[in-house]
Structure formats: C-alpha cells, structure tokens
Amino acid sequence: MSKSTAEIRQAFLDFFHTKGHQVVPSSSLVPNNDPTLLFTNAGMNQFKDVFLGQDKRSYSRATTAQRCVRAGGKHNDLENVGYTARHHTFFEMLGNFSFGDYFKHDAISYAWELLTGKDWFNLPKEKLWVTVYQTDDEAYDIWKNDVGIPAERIIRIGDNKGAPYASDNFWQMGDTGPCGPCTEIFYDHGEHIWGGPPGSPEEDGDRYIEIWNIVFMQFNRHADGTMEPLPKPSVDTGMGLERITAVLQHVNSNYEIDLFRDLITVVANVTGATDDLSNKSLRVIADHIRSCAFLICDGVVPSNENRGYVLRRIIRRAIRHGNMLGAKDTFFYKLVAPLLEVMGAAGEELKRQQAVVEQILKTEEEQFARTLERGLQLLDDELAKLSGDILDGETAFRLYDTYGFPVDLTADVCRERNISVDEAGFAVAMENQRRRARESSGFGTDYNELIKVDERSDFSGYDHNEQQATVTAIFRDGESVNQIQAGEEAIVILDKTAFYAESGGQVGDSGILSNTNCAFCVIDTQKYGQAIGHIGKLEKGTLSVNHNINAVIDIERRDAIRLNHSATHLLHAALRQILGEHVSQKGSLVNDKYLRFDFSHFEAMKPEQIRLVEDLVNAEVRQNSPVVTELMDLETAKVKGAMALFGEKYEEQVRVLSMGDFSTELCGGTHANRTGDIGLFRIIAESGTAAGIRRIEAITGKKAVESVHQQVDLLQDIAQLVKSDIHSLSEKVRMTLDRAKALEKELQQLKDQQAAQESSSLASKAKEVKGVKLLVSQLSNTEPKMLRTMVDDLKNQLGSAIIVLSTISDDKVSLIVGVTKDLTAKIRAGELISSVAQQIGGKGGGRSDMAQAGGSDIEALPSALDSVEEWVASRL
C-alpha cells in the first residue's frame, strides 16, 4: 500500500534526522527580514543569511518541510494552476541543508539512499536519471563510480540559457555572491507517456519529471565574473512533496495524489459539481484553498496592495471557478476544515486559527459576490463585441477598478475563449490612476531627498535627556553652510545627540540646542542616512560648524511620547489575544498627544471587542511590569518570540523590548520604564482605512484622565438639562426620547388631518379639459413631504384626474404630478413633470402615475403652472 502524503513528509524528515540533521519547522510564508521577497518560495529562504555568512546557527545540518507560495512577483505560477499537472500556488518543499559541513559526496549519497533504500522510498534504480553541470566532473564521478548509475543515464547540461554559467544546472543567488553547480534527479514514468530525457528536444514532456534538485554552493562570484572557491562550501536541496508523492503513489498528476483527491471530492460536494479529477475548476479551487488558508494563517489579509492583493487575486479566482461549477452560496470558507484533515501535523498552526481564517474567507467571498455577476456580464458583453482576439487594457482596467476583477481573473475567462488580454494597456491604465492619486495626495518631498549628509550621529537618548555635542554640519534651504544667523531656519547635524529622530512611527523630538552665545529651537528631528538632523530656527546669536552646544530635549513632550509608544506595544499584543493572531501591524503614529495603530483585520471591531482590548491593556498597566530592553542577535530574538514588522530590514544586533510575558517586540523607539507609568489607556476611535486594514486611535496618561473628566462634565451638563442625576440619566433620556417620539407622531397625525382637509377643498377647484379633470395648484404653508399624501387623497376623491401640486420651502420649489391609472396611456406623469421642471430650472422623474421634481427659479413657478393646461390639452 502506498504511503500517504503526510507519511512521505514525515519519512523525509525522519531520514535526515537519522543523519544528524536538525529538524527545523517551516518558516512563515511571509519572509522575515527579507524585504526583497514577496513570499517564501523555497526551503533555503529562512537560511539565506546563514549561507551568506551573516548569521550562525547552533547546528551545521538542517532539514525542513517548508510551506511555499509562488503567486505574484518573479515566481508566479497562478495562471497555470489547474491547467497543468504540476503547477501550484502553494506547495511544500522538502529539503536538507549543509552549512559548511558535508558536501557533494554525502549529499548525493543521502539522496540516493532515501530514494532507493528498501526501508525508505524504495524506487526502482533503473527509473532514475540525473543531470550535472557540464564541467562538474566531481559530481559526475560520484554518480557514476560511487552510486553506480550507468553513464547513459547521467546527462551533462551546459550553459543552455545564452550566457556563461546561465544553465539549468548552475545556481546563483544574484549577479554576484554565492553560486555553484547543481545536480538534478529525474524519474522516468515510462514509454507510455510522451517526452524525452533532460537536454533532449522532447524534455518538456511529462515522461521524465524532476523530483530533486541538489545545489552545491561552491563559489563566490565577483563583479568581473571570476569564481573564487568558498572556504566552506554548502549544500541546499529541494524536493517538491507533491511531486515525489505522485511518483510514490504511481500517478502522473499531482492532482491525483491522496491529498488532492480528498480535497477535490469535498470541493465537488460544496459546489454541487461532479467529482472529476480532470476538472480544471475543481483543481483550481483545491489548490487555492491551500495557499489562501496558510497565507491568512501567517498574517496576510486581503487588500488592494502587495501581499494582500495577491491573496485577494487567488481568492477571487477560486470564487469565479466556483461560480462556473454552479455554486450558489458562499462555499470557499467551508474547505478550511477538510484542508486541516488532509494536512495532518503540518496544519497545527492553521488549526489554532481556523475560525479566523474561515471568517476572513467568508467575508471576502461575500464582498466579491456582490459584483461578480455584474462584472462577468460586462465582460461577456465586451467579448461579444470583440472583432479580434485581444481584449483592450482599458476594459480590463474598468473590470478591476469597478468590479474588483484582478487582471489575471479576466485573462482566465478570456483564455477559455482563446482571447488574450492587452496587459501592457492594463498596466498603462493602472499607472495613470496611480499618477492621478499621487498628484492629488499632496504628499511633500522626503527629507532625505532634500539633503545628502556624510556625517554620522551617535544617539544617546535611551539613557539621557541632554547631551554635550559638536555641530558637524548645517543645512539651509537644502545647501550646506558654515554658519546661520538669528531668525534663520536650518537643519543642524551633531556628532552625538539625545534627540530621537522620527522612526518606526514615533515622531522626532523637539527641544533646544544652546550655548552662551546662541539658542536654536528644534521643532522636529529626522534621519539623514547615518546622521540625525535637528530641524528648527535660530532664535538668537550665531551658530557655526564646530561650535559646542548643549542639546536638551523637551522632556515633558518626550515622556508623553514614551507612554504612547509603550501603550502601542500593549495594544498590539491585546489585539492579537482578542481578535486572533492574524492581527499584524500595518502602520503606526506615536506622538505626544495620542497614538494611532493600523492593523490587519477583516471587519469593524464590535463595541464589546473594543472594551475587551481596552480592559486587557489597562490590566497590564496595573501589573506595573518593568519595560525591559535587551540587545541580541536577530535569530535569538526570533527564538525568544519577539514580533518583527514584516518587510523591515533589521541589523544583526536588534533591540528587543519586553513587558512581562505580555508583549515582546523588536523596537528602536523610546519607552516608559514600567507599564504602570502609562497610568490609563483609552480607545477614542476605531475605523477602517482600506480593505482589510483597521485603525485604532487611543490616548494615555494625563490625556486619558482629562478625557474621563470631560465625559463626566458632559454627563453632568446633560443631567441638569433633563433634570436628572448621572446615575438615572440613561432612563431619563430614554423617557424624554419616548415622549418626543410620541409628540412627533401626534404632530404628524395633525398634519395628515390638515392635508386631508386641504385636499377636500382643493378637489372642488378641479376643471375639465377635453372631458378630463385637471387640478393645478400652488400651496402655501405645506411641507414638501405632504404633497404625496395629498395627491393620493385627491385621486381617491376625484376618481379620474390629472393633479399637479407645488409648494415653496427653503427657497426651493417642490413639484408633484399624479395621474390616475385610466389616463396614463395618454398622459404620463414623468413627461408632464419634466416639462414643468425645465421651466423652473430643475429636473425630475418617476413612474407613469406619479412623478416628483424640484427647482430653484421661484419667480418662474406661476407661468410654469399656467402652461400645464395647454400641455395636457395637446395630448388628449
């Protein structure tokens, strides 16, 4: 009996564990400390700094089953998913790694033992082929002489991509840096499947499938192209779990392995489709639920930017394929539970966040469902009008902008009809929109665009509020100067300073730079490369380069900022506890007045959730835990559980800020000494800033206490107005509102009675025009909203009639036309009111029996009403 996918994953890890490898958990799909990478797309990503010599581990051998996503960015398999046997947005990469430990001989021997060993995968040796780099004689000899593969199944691959070392069998991280040859292992599915061995004209067929790539990091490539041998060569290998499972389960498509068979069956059930492993839509959905669920689990939330937009594209592609299968209701979120069953031990983290993942997927599907049908109809209409086989970029952009159709979803629909999308035209339309947004945003120029500073400033503000320093540079109007005079604004650079430069959401310090001859008032502090710039105005004297000054921060302002920054950390931790671990920081502002925190979450917070978060933060404030700062290497910080901002680039040494066991984050800002210093934390606003992004604004310390006093004062004022006290205020206000509601109802009844009386008197004023009753009247002291009631009453009284009523309120004319049903074939209310409205500078419309309009030309009203009789007569 074949091994299951879960058993194969575990067997791989167990094998390398017996060979002295550390089993390392899969890292997040969101790469930490590598802003160049959209998603984790290979097993070596989490070891990149180790291979570069910038990080050290306690082990020299490692093995992983790494979750990977290839959708968006350089590595994008999205458009092929569902249409081929082996493309996926999500896959698991099995890998073993040597950091300066073993090299080619052991790497090849381990791979062969695992693949062919009777206690392991037990593949037929004659089914395996290998490739090596053209000049890698060492690897060739190991395969031929040590392993014993016949020469005819060992293929040398040269520079087959048009440049030196540009080869399928030569790996390089970039134009320079670590690189080296690789050897790949292929499985031969047999003669019944079309395709040739690697390097042959038929190599793109499905007969010979690559199952393992073993990279030998052997050289350091210099800018001039020379290759220098590395002192400690390393090994990086990768084997797709889904591919090796297909081989071991004797199937030709990844979608036929047990994991996908089970998922596809569930997809068919929830969409009402026929269970068919070859159905492209079933394949797409089964693949996409894996990438979507694990991306959300790792903190990505659907949005219109960056990683969030890639996730949104994948979700919407799945929803559209569900629509094709006939799914009538939301279905995608229902696949999370069955996904957990097939993932086994690899889904433990997903299991903890199952409810959150399901809710995010359901919300996203409900939002897209509102526009999906209309968007598909528009696309169908455009394709029906198409004379060629290319859909223009403007239409693709309109589908994106109006209906939320990612361009690849539009391309997906078009491909089914052998039509392509002008993606270049789409990109132009997208860039035009971005340019318009930039032009209308009013954002100023970045400080770093204004001046270039070569100096370096040492920051002492963690421990000091003032600092004796020397002026190393002065900039006025973006130019370097040696001296400034009283009244001049400038940026002053010091060799060392206690002033914190704006960073990580915390605003820059303010204060005074002074000596016996001058005083420079600092209103802001910013970074300029390695220098810290003090922005402000010289209030008196003369300040020159090389002057010695005393730099003193505004301590009261800094203290307020410190409290708000520490409260931000507590807020972040509390949100993750109350809302779920999908919450991650998306932006922040910390100043002396308040804090603002943007975070990923799929819906508005409920009032009770806001209260729970506020209570949790205040409980930690009352704990009065020490705020501890430690310097450590980044890897140690990760092990300690410190939260880092995804996409941020950190130095080798990082500052880790801890508040008891409640919060641990990487942070370079200034903070309170103890959580109790915060005093009181109050949330003053919660709102949305973009799809999937929420914002909380909060205050602390004195500001929070002041807000409590203000609320109490307001309650007391209201209590006095309604003749109550604070304790019974709610009941008193409720009684007052009930009374007001009753009076409004009574007033409306009186108005209705008045309207009925007026209607009775008006009915007698109707005249006959060609045998039809016509009533035209301008009313005084009548509210516009009463006109409709009066028309209905007059219809009942007159039986058959045309009624035109008007009134003037707030310097505006209100008109209404009513026509009884028996007359609408000749006189349509909408046409009549348009004729009258045009004469008073207005417009209107409605049904054939009732229409309303408004206008601004009061003086023209009498003549407009006089014209009604002639208009009616001409149509009878």
Curated annotation (Swiss-Prot):
Top enzyme class: ligase
Binding site for Zn(2+): 565, 569, 667, 671
Cofactor dependency: Zn(2+)
InterPro entries reported in the protein's UniProt record: aa-tRNA-synth_II/BPL/LPL (IPR045864), Ala-tRNA-lgiase_IIc (IPR002318), Ala-tRNA-ligase_IIc_anticod-bd (IPR018162), Ala-tRNA-synth_IIc_core (IPR018165), Ala-tRNA-synth_IIc_N (IPR018164), Ala-tRNA_ligase (IPR050058), Ala_tRNA_ligase_euk/bac (IPR023033), DHHA1_dom (IPR003156)
Keywords for this protein: Aminoacyl-tRNA synthetase, ATP-binding, Cytoplasm, Ligase, Metal-binding, Nucleotide-binding, Protein biosynthesis, RNA-binding, tRNA-binding, Zinc
Keyword field contains tRNA processing: no
Catalytic activity entry: tRNA(Ala) + L-alanine + ATP = L-alanyl-tRNA(Ala) + AMP + diphosphate
UniProt GO BP: alanyl-tRNA aminoacylation; negative regulation of DNA-templated transcription
EC id: 6.1.1.7
UniProt-annotated location(s): Cytoplasm
GO molecular function terms noted in the UniProt entry: alanine-tRNA ligase activity; aminoacyl-tRNA deacylase activity; ATP binding; tRNA binding; zinc ion binding
Any single Pfam family the record assigns to this protein: tRNA_SAD
Cofactor binding description: Binds 1 zinc ion per subunit.
GO annotation, cellular component aspect: cytosol
NCBIfam families: alaS
PANTHER family: ALANINE--TRNA LIGASE, CYTOPLASMIC, ALANYL-TRNA SYNTHETASE
The family this protein is said to belong to: Belongs to the class-II aminoacyl-tRNA synthetase family.
Physiological role: Catalyzes the attachment of alanine to tRNA(Ala) in a two-step reaction: alanine is first activated by ATP to form Ala-AMP and then transferred to the acceptor end of tRNA(Ala). Also edits incorrectly charged Ser-tRNA(Ala) and Gly-tRNA(Ala) via its editing domain.
Domain-level remarks: Consists of three domains; the N-terminal catalytic domain, the editing domain and the C-terminal C-Ala domain. The editing domain removes incorrectly charged amino acids, while the C-Ala domain, along with tRNA(Ala), serves as a bridge to cooperatively bring together the editing and aminoacylation centers thus stimulating deacylation of misacylated tRNAs.
Subunit note: Homotetramer.
Name of the protein: Alanine--tRNA ligase
Organism the protein comes from: Photorhabdus laumondii subsp. laumondii (strain DSM 15139 / CIP 105565 / TT01)
